[in-house]
Structures are given as structure tokens and as C-alpha cells.
């Protein structure tokens, strides 16, 4: 199974925090027999989230999105994913 991990957060891109989630998730997926095809770190921006989720949907059977769910107004991940998948979260 081909997997893509998407980590969302300006803090990661700015080097303010370390992305340990992707490292852990990748190790576990590999242990379970999945092929991690890509690990993406992207900004907390609607267009970027939409673009990379759309890319991942066309490339992988499993997509894991982590981050982008903090209390600040720039954390729009939940809203964008609900719109993308045309559902409530």
C-alpha cells in the first residue's frame, strides 16, 4: 500500500518545532508493510492544503494528515478537509 504523510504547520516550516510525527508515522507504516512514497510539510494555508491533499489523493491509497489543528486562526485544516471531501468533520 502506497502512503503519503502530510504535515501542516507554519511552525514546522519556520523551524520552530521539529516534525517528529512524520518520523514516527513513517516508521510505523513501514513496519506494517506500507510504502511511504512522500512526506510533505506544508503551510497553514487553504490553497496549499487543498493542492497537496488533491495531489496525495491521486498518488496514494493511504493519506495521513497531521498538524494544523491548533487554536490559532491560521489553523484551517479541518475546514479545508471538510470542504475537500464535501462532508462534516
Regions found by a protein language model. Name each.
Residues 1-89:
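Non-catalytic beta/alpha edge segments that cap or flank active sites
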Amino acid at each position: 500500500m502506497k502512503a503519503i504523510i502530510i504535515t501542516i504547520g507554519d511552525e514546522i516550516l519556520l523551524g520552530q518545532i521539529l516534525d517528529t510525527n512524520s518520523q514516527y508515522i513513517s516508521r510505523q507504516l513501514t513496519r506494517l508493510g506500507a510504502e511511504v512514497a512522500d512526506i510533505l510539510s506544508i503551510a497553514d494555508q487553504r490553497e496549499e492544503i487543498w493542492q497537496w491533499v488533491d495531489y496525495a489523493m491521486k498518488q496514494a491509497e493511504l493519506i495521513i494528515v497531521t498538524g494544523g489543528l491548533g487554536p490559532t486562526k491560521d489553523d484551517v485544516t479541518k475546514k479545508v478537509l471538510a470542504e475537500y471531501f464535501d462532508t462534516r468533520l
